[in-house]
Amino acid sequence: MHKLFTYLCSALLLVTATSCEKKTEKLLLGGSGWNKIVIIDKNTKQVEWEHPLEKGWECNSAVATPDGNILFAYARGAKLIDRNHQEIWNIAAPDTCEMQTARVLPDGNYLLGWVGHPAVIMEVSPKGEILSRTEYETGIEHPHAQFRQQNKNARGNYLMPLFATSDVREISPRGEVVKITRLEGTPFTTLALANGNHWVACGDGHSLMEVNLDNGEVARRYGENDIKGARLFFVAGLLPAKDGGLYVCNWQGHDKNAVEANSPQVFEINDKGEVIWNLNDNERFGMISTISTIE
């Protein structure tokens, strides 16, 4: 009986210990100027999967889909691939345009967007079926100076951050301007918050700000040297982290001396703006402008 009791206690302890182990978070990373997209273990910072990109495939949007596939924009189009690198579908952009946006929407469909004349926003099913298409003329002559990551807001409109005009435009599905919010720098992406505000990554403005896009009021702003341990360069992709924190992609391609600053390529801040995790390894990782969690 004593042996049986000891065995049962040991088994219970093993189950308890196993159940208490934290599941390791995985991050999908990519970036303009980097020749691959990768999945890393957040804790070890080791690359566990990588997919090569051809020369000229500028990737500013890469995201994991709910079923574990990888959706990414690569300037010439957008692809959905599986973890075995098999292409599920590919939607090409016209020769004079650049596909820059590839996002997963809350309803499970995807948001794609290319810059050009006009710029085009599409909602696409997981099977690659184009469900809707919105055209909008930005008025910005050079397509590359238009947008990178667009998002869809709770009103069902599209948020288009524009480089050349330093603003975020809310565009209806019919291609009509609903609202223009003037900001600073070269806005790269937006991220909705529970309070109705949005984080806006301001690119070459070397800044990150929380903004009410309805009235333009800035609730918080971090400038180039405001975050201890992370000098801001081109502030790019954003991702919500646990406990109200935020992942920030700190793309360094516009400053030839960026490596000397020893500032992380991507980092996580808590709700107080303190760095609690970072990735700073220019030998193993390229310039990072997009981030996603992945199972």
Model-derived segments and their meaning:
Residues 1-8:
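Bacterial N-terminal signal peptides that target proteins for export
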Residues 8, 12-24:
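Bacterial Sec-dependent signal peptides at the C-terminal "C-region" and cleavage site
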